[in-house]
Amino acid sequence: MNGFSDLNPSESKPSLSQLAPLEAILFDVDGTLCDSDPIHLIAFQELLQEIGFNNGVPIDEKFFVENIAGKHNSEIALLLFPDDVSRGLKFCDEKEALYRKIVAEKIKPLDGLIKLTKWIEDRGLKRAAVTNAPKENAELMISKLGLTDFFQAVILGSECEFPKPHPGPYLKALEVLNVSKEHTLVFEDSISGIKAGVAAGMPVIGLTTGNPASLLMQAKPAFLIENYADPKLWAVLEELDNKS
């Protein structure tokens, strides 16, 4: 979204040395691999305005961040259509179709992501995508970013008993990859996602692509970065290299 950058000033030199030797890295998809939240917002604004939601006034970024970002469509349907959830789910399907149409032309990786994927591959670390996004969205974004062969597993919230913020999707990723939470790192950009990773027992690095740092810190990430080119991240990875 805006690339919120009011990063927590007290965290000047974070360390994740307790993860050494690192076994795996888990990534959310929306807002974590790419800055896709602005496209979700456009799709929601367009379709909600068509049906006269909020008296025809487009929802703003604040409403989106506080009520929609990072949430599963079942939650969003209930929020937008509390008296007719089946209509809400149908609306969400229509919104996802519009999103896929727009995102296919606009998607690009966050700064530093390709460098990080090479770092991960060079060290033979296991990796998975863990997302609340619908399957079609996740597959499209991962494919358009050129990461289909990079990820060894894609865990969908809809295929778990509960989606994020429940820890289930991240626990399933650990099981599928056969790695331990004590040696696995998570990247997330939403409160819902950070809560899920933390509840699963792993340190989570939060990205401020779509949410203010002050909001993300409530979910207790290890620390925050603006993107994968952030020197703070590479200092942590270098320390992990030296400890392994």
Curated annotation (Swiss-Prot):
Active-site residues, record numbering mapped to chain: 28 (nucleophile), 30 (proton donor)
Superkingdom of the source species: Eukaryota
Induction behaviour: Induced by NaCl and sorbitol.
SUPFAM superfamilies the record matches: HAD-like
Variation of activity with pH: Optimum pH is 7.0.
NCBIfam families named in the record: HAD-SF-IA-v3
Protein name: Haloacid dehalogenase-like hydrolase domain-containing protein Sgpp
Source species: Arabidopsis thaliana
Chain's gene name: SGPP
